[in-house]
Amino acid sequence: MKTFHDLSQLIFPTRCFGCGRLGINICTECRREWIPHIYKTHVDSMKVHSGLIYTPTASKIILAAKEVSIQGADQLLISAIIHVLEKAKFGAQPFKLIPIPSSKGSQRRRGRSFIVDLTHQISEVVGIPMNDCLQISRQVKDQSGLSRSKRVTNMNGAFTLKKDAIVRGNQILIDDVVTTGATLKEAARALNSQGFHAVGSVSAVTACVALPLR
């Protein structure tokens, strides 16, 4: 096993997610940018709590987790979200965690529904149930290169509840980063369109936040 590990390090050496330095997943300098705090924003009336500012280093960590499925990057995102869930004040309990789903194309490319997978692991650690009730109901574009207005248009009407989904009580939407709020806003709309607004509250937790929202 050690021989295989040594060989893999020769072919695919461990590099810092942030700066590419050899030898460790995240170096001391980049780790200084990845110390979770609590950042509060709003998407319309929905409260959003995030653990870190969305920096170039944070962007690289998210890409390493999302597009390459590197476990070390996953764990950095998971720890940031858990920090927020444990430290932020969400009011009435209990809550359930609702992950933002990936498109079918993204799931095929990555081999998983990224945030659903992370939220499942988070749920097991913090003991808050996961409610995987949302699905993408039509084709959407990659949000990364879109302006704010185009992101809103891209996500408008994109989410629906899964068949036989049951949504009761207070819910926390989970995502990796909030930049414009278009995705979280659409997720809240999908919940409220099913009459959920009358029976509970919707808030959100993300690992990172782009300040100010774009």
Feature locations, PLM:
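Glycine-rich phosphate/pyrophosphate-handling loop used in enzymes and phosphotransfer proteins
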Residues: 1-214
